[in-house]
Amino acid sequence: MSRDDVSIAVVGGGIGGLAAAVSMLRAGVDVHVFEQAPALVEVGAGIQISPNASRLLHRWGLRAALDRTGVRPVAVHQRRWDDGRTLQRAPLGEAAEAAFGAPYYHFHRGDLLEALADALPPERLHLGHRLAGFTDHGDRVELRFANGATVSADVLVGADGIHSTVRGELFGPEKPRFTGCIAYRGLVPADRLGHLELEVLANNWMGPGGHFVHYFVAGGRLVNFVAINERETWTRESWTDRGEVADALAAFKGWHPQVGAIIGAVDETFIWALFDRAPLDHWSVGRVTLLGDACHAMLPFMAQGAAQSIENGATLTACLVRRGGADVASALRRYEALRLPRATRLQEMSRANKTRFHLPDGPAQQERDALLATRGDRSIAALGWLYSHDASVIDGNHAHP
């Protein structure tokens, strides 16, 4: 059975959809990506890619592209909100690569998206294709697009985000859950912050009702920040709503001066309400399955949303190569069985970190800080189950290149 005997239509040209397509093409699978936007334009924000995802991207031939724009932090610092005290320093950099076999990166999201898109032949990526509906005929899936185009494929992969049309068609309408958090995000030219003498770190400042993350991206030219603050209610879901710098500064009044200095140096900030969805019991129906935020939208508090989407693509490719076009439904069930428990675990851990990061000063916070201090170097080693994972391995063997 050849690898090109099954045709795949991926709906959604974000990081997860493009990564899946790159993985499939490397394995000789016939795949096309359909993206509703007329151009691939990623929001101005940072993204963390841990070794469990970077090993896959390297294997797919992207290492040189990633090294051009990616920043490799030497450590992650957990810090106290008011006095800046480092509660824990966990090594990354060379130590993480030696331990897990692949590096930990920080990227501008646009740089990562561009690297993935450049790895696809232009004829495999179809822009301006908004999915209007689909029909699973049993032996194939027919896709209908708002521009009037129709496409037939053996498998439909819905990688179309938290507002997934494919998920809605499979399982009915469902509103995402507001998590009680909003985030101000921004990118600051690094030369504006030279007086702070920032190290090349992943920084997480934890305080009452919020936390503040910052790190270098774009080859060190920019500092990305995300300032998370708790709110009781919110209705809009958007990555692109403009925020007020003054509001972000007010939300973090009383925090360490470095926090205010980073926020205050930004030209513009965007406000992002954090929504997620309850974990699904299954992702696949017939010849249709889901990938990424479409099936496991999670808070960014484990820095695993994109990484898990990339893992999805590797595992789905491996399952399709193993089973081939003759047994698509079985391949999708295998993919789901391998991926759903891990993604659900990380959804739940990400939600738990909201409470852990936002503790008010008091006994629970003191217990958390004491525990962080005792772990040190061991905190990263404890994540071996996460960072050492190779999502392309099925039954102990690599199922594709």
Predicted segment positions?
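C-terminal helical "tail/cap" subdomain of flavin- and related membrane-associated enzymes
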Residues: 1-6, 68, 261, 302-303, ...
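Conserved N-terminal helical subregion
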Residues: 2-8, 50-189, 232-246, 372, ...
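Conserved mid-domain beta->alpha element of the FAD-binding
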Residues: 9-38, 157-158, 184, 214, ...
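Conserved N-terminal glycine-rich FAD pyrophosphate-binding loop of Rossmann-like flavoproteins
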Residues: 39-55
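Amphipathic alpha-helix from the class-I
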Residues: 228-236, 257, 318-326
